[in-house]
UniProtKB/Swiss-Prot annotation:
GO CC annotations, alphabetized: cytosol
Gene: pyrG
Family: Belongs to the CTP synthase family.
Region of interest: Amidoligase domain: 1-269
Top EC class for this record: ligase
Function: Catalyzes the ATP-dependent amination of UTP to CTP with either L-glutamine or ammonia as the source of nitrogen. Regulates intracellular CTP levels through interactions with the four ribonucleotide triphosphates.
Keyword terms, alphabetized: ATP-binding, Glutamine amidotransferase, Ligase, Magnesium, Metal-binding, Nucleotide-binding, Pyrimidine biosynthesis
Pathway(s) the chain acts in: Pyrimidine metabolism; CTP biosynthesis via de novo pathway; CTP from UDP: step 2/2
PROSITE patterns: GATASE_TYPE_1
Annotated GO MF terms: ATP binding; CTP synthase activity; glutaminase activity; identical protein binding; metal ion binding
Record protein name field: CTP synthase
Amino acids binding Mg(2+): D74, E143
Length: 546
């Protein structure tokens, strides 16, 4: 971090899920549109080292960065909103902070000192914030996870309070997102929760510079004056976060209120006028869609759609590029069997089986894949979805009825999917993996090059000889079965650079049947979409028209 870099801290109050991530990403978009180099950070107060082993039903999606970090789903928002890519340095947790401090204590780096939250934990938080910012960055927006008042967030709030003192007011800014409940019966907007939230923040030693008030309807100047009076925040530093049809409208709404101009003024930034023409085009494309196409997503985390956040967005983005609204029909794979499978898919244009872990709901996914293959329904499999497509093909085309994955059935005699026995850690060291190895941080993670087969549909879609996609898996196609599968008509249209790992499969006789070991959804953005998803949606549109 250079001596001119500015830091905007975004906190949240009253309740969770107000949209801190979208607000932070929207501010980054606005500042980027003014010619500034902007990056972002997410600080998570949970004690897990990373979200890699957390249930998607509790935490939502685990977003994987290009350099192989398992991170919070908000980093997906960041990458979809701004051009800079996130890395391991852009997300850290309480667990990671404590892990670093305790390792240093064991090494004797603290020279016998008593290790305490202040100064040792707060110093490590400050170090990670400052060291994670490249020298060419003009502004970094740091989102503090959790809600003000939570005991877990206190070390982070104390650390940023100290940073304000150390860096000065001209280099730091506190933006606080809060809730203004609208009581329909009374027809009133209530400001009391916001007053108490700011009071709670002040009790920690932080005075908000800017307030963003989430409300389902616009509030007028009288409410602004009241909020300003009781929070010590200037009236012209209070902004509305109103509900919109698409989250990609949020930057435009903030710009209309002069939010970015106020940030430039408060931080004394040398910035040009905002050029939001490209972003306006993105929003216009979303708003102008005419048709609709329905995709069935067959998974086991469907009770929380946030578990598939990037995948949902990738499908929506592809639909916008093709001029249709994508409607996702979430199907719980545990409910699917041979007797009812048709009832789930009779009204859909395509089927998708996403990634996942564990044996629950596996047979329902395999039955769904078989239905798509036999009925010429466009199919896309991702990660586990590709592995199950290989298992289904081995069972029903090769006749290997007990074909399985050693992850799901360790004693299977025909493990067409097996464990990758060698993996590379974050520090670049190579380790050997067994079925009893730790689960956390021991996967094939991050961007890897995939070489595409000449003449394949994948090569035609990507219009390239090789691509880089992000991975998150421990298991791969067993190379001992590849030749037999190819002889039976399955094409391995993408392989790792060393030709050892199978990355893409397709069935040439099928209308559109592709599955990939990687997670291409992590690189889809509303600006650029993603070629694989666009081809898939096009196939779904054509199938729907027929």
């Amino acid at each position: 971090m250079n001596s001119n870099t500015k830091i905007i801290f975004v906190t949240g109050g009253v309740v969770s899920s107000l949209g801190k991530g979208v607000t932070a990403a929207s501010l980054a978009t606005l500042l980027e549109s003014r010619g500034l180099n902007v990056t972002m950070m997410k600080l998570d107060p949970y004690i897990n080292v990373d979200p890699g082993t957390m249930s998607p039903l509790q935490h939502g999606e685990v977003f994987v960065t290009e350099d192989g970090a398992e991170t919070d789903l908000d980093l997906g928002h960041y990458e979809r909103f701004i051009r800079n890519k996130m890395t391991q340095a852009n997300n850290f947790t309480t667990g990671k902070v404590y892990q670093s401090v305790l390792r240093r204590e064991r090494k004797g780096d603290y020279l016998g000192a008593t290790i305490q939250v202040i100064p040792h934990i707060t110093d490590e938080i400050k170090r990670r914030i400052c060291s994670g910012i490249a020298d060419d960055v003009d502004v970094v927006i740091v989102e503090i996870g959790g809600t003000v008042g939570d005991i877990e967030s206190q070390p982070f709030l104390e650390a940023i309070r100290q940073l304000r003192i150390e860096l000065g007011r001209n280099r730091t800014l506190f933006v606080h997102l809060t809730l203004l409940p609208y009581i329909k019966v009374a027809g009133e907007i209530k400001t009391k929760p916001t007053q108490h939230s700011v009071k709670e923040l002040r009790g920690i030693g932080i005075q908000a510079d800017v307030l963003v008030c989430r409300c389902e309807k616009k509030f007028d100047d009288s409410e602004k004056r009241k909020i300003a009076l009781f929070t010590n925040v200037d009236q012209d530093c209070i902004f509305t976060a109103e509900d919109v049809d698409t989250i990609y409208e949020v930057p435009l709404k903030y710009n209309q209120q002069g939010f970015d101009a106020k940030l430039v003024e408060l931080l004394n930034l040398n910035a040009k006028e905002a050029d939001l023409s490209e972003w306006q085009n993105v929003v216009n494309t979303i708003i102008d869609v005419k048709g609709e196409v329905t995709i069935a997503m067959v998974g086991k985390y469907v009770s929380l759609t946030e578990a598939y956040k990037s995948l949902n967005e990738a499908l929506y983005n592809a639909g916008y590029k093709k001029g249709v609204k994508v409607k996702i029909k979430f199907v719980d794979s545990e409910d699917v069997n041979e007797n009812n499978v048709e009832s789930y898919f009779k009204d859909v244009a395509a089927i998708l089986v996403p990634g996942g872990f564990g044996s629950r709901g596996i047979e329902g996914k395999i039955i769904s894949i078989k239905y798509a293959r036999e009925n010429q329904i466009p199919f896309l499999g991702i990660c586990l979805g590709m592995q199950l497509a290989v298992i289904e093909y081995a069972r029903n085309i090769l006749g290997i009825k007990d074909a399985h994955s050693s992850e799901l059935e360790p004693t299977t005699a025909n493990p067409v999917i097996g464990l990758i026995t060698e993996w590379q850690a974050e520090d670049g060291t190579v380790h050997q993996r067994t079925h009893s190895s730790d689960l956390g941080g021991t996967m094939r993670l991050g961007g890897y090059k995939c070489v595409l087969k000449q003449g394949s549909r994948a090569r035609e879609i990507y219009q390239a000889d090789e691509v880089v996609e992000r991975h998150r898996h421990r298991y791969e196609v067993n190379s001992n079965y590849v030749e037999r599968l190819e002889e039976a008509g399955l094409i391995f249209s993408g392989r790792s650079e060393d030709n050892k790992l199978m990355e893409l499969i397709e069935i040439p006789q099928h209308k559109w049947f592709i599955a990939c070991q990687a997670h291409p959804e992590f690189t889809s953005t509303p600006r650029y979409g993603h070629k694989l998803f666009e081809s898939y949606i096009q196939a779904a549109i054509e199938n729907s028209n027929n």
